[in-house]
């Protein structure tokens, strides 16, 4: 919804000035550079297995809500053809995910809150390397919509090593997105919405550090698979 409102407002502004074609030759450059700032919503998809502890407890993990993070990238754009560009945009993404653990087998008489539910805050600082193919429509006055598809490597440099669930630092993601080039008098503004889907199971099941701590180990034992997902709203300045 936010992306649609921002895009409509910027497009309307550009069309108000469409009698003058801004930056007419910018798309003919073989290579150009830029940068972006934006926000991201990080998520993880958790596959629970219904593991039961020795005392009969069954814990389930979930991410019930999401909070926005911040991201910044630099951009190198290579023109392949009239409507095709290859874009490389390394950067950093900051965000966090709150995992809730619920003991579904806790009887009503259990009053200790830690026996009923717990939470874990996973803060992430991703170094990202994103490579996308940009497929653009023909320019209409001062706007030009486009779609993107590509891959993104991520490496988390802010891992807490004592958490209930430990996730691998590295991951690879498939990305699809949409956006619009808006040609302004002094630069090209490109709001873009991108969806990122993790390709690997990032859960680290081998936890020798928790062999003597079954109270913590039960959370890892209750989960089979964890994959990263992310929604990113960025504004490119080119």
Model features per residue range: what roles?
Residues 14-68, 230, 236-238:
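Short glycine/proline- and aromatic-enriched beta-strand/turn motifs that initiate or cap beta-hairpins
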Residues 27, 78-82, 135-141, 182-185, ...:
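Outer-membrane beta-barrel strand-turn architecture
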Residues 29-31, 66-70, 123-129, 143, ...:
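Residues that define the transmembrane beta-barrel architecture of outer-membrane proteins
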Residues 31-37, 86-90, 127-129, 145-151, ...:
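Transmembrane beta-strands of outer-membrane beta-barrel proteins
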Residues 39-43, 92-96, 135-137, 151-157, ...:
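Transmembrane beta-strands of outer-membrane beta-barrel pores
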Residues 43-45, 83-86, 141-143, 186-189:
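Repeated loop/turn-to-beta-strand initiation elements of outer-membrane beta-barrel proteins
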Residues 49-111:
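Glycine- and aromatic-enriched membrane insertion/assembly motifs of diderm outer-membrane
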Residues 185-238:
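Predominantly the C-terminal beta-signal and adjacent terminal strand-loop region
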């Amino acid at each position: 919804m936010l992306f649609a409102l921002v895009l409509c407002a910027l497009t309307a502004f550009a069309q108000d000035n469409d009698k003058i074609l801004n930056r007419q030759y910018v798309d003919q450059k073989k290579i150009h550079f830029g940068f972006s700032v934006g926000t991201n919503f990080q998520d993880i998809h958790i596959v629970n297995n219904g593991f039961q502890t020795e005392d009969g407890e069954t814990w389930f993990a979930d991410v019930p809500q999401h909070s926005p993070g911040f991201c910044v990238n630099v951009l190198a754009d290579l023109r392949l053809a009239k409507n095709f560009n290859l874009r490389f945009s390394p950067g950093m993404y900051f965000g966090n995910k709150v995992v809730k653990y619920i003991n579904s087998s806790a009887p009503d008489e259990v009053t200790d809150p830690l026996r009923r539910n717990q939470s874990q805050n996973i803060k992430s600082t991703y170094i990202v390397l994103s490579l996308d193919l940009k497929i653009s429509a023909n320019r209409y006055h001062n706007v030009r919509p486009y779609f993107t598809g590509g891959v993104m490597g991520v490496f988390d440099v802010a891992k807490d090593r004592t958490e209930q669930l430990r996730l691998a630092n590295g991951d690879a993601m498939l990305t699809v997105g949409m956006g619009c080039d808006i040609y302004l008098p002094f630069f090209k503004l490109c709001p873009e919405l991108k969806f990122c889907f993790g390709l690997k199971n990032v859960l680290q099941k081998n936890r020798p550090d928790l062999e003597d701590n079954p109270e913590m180990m039960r959370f890892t034992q209750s989960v089979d698979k964890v994959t990263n997902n992310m929604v990113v709203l960025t504004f490119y300045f080119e």
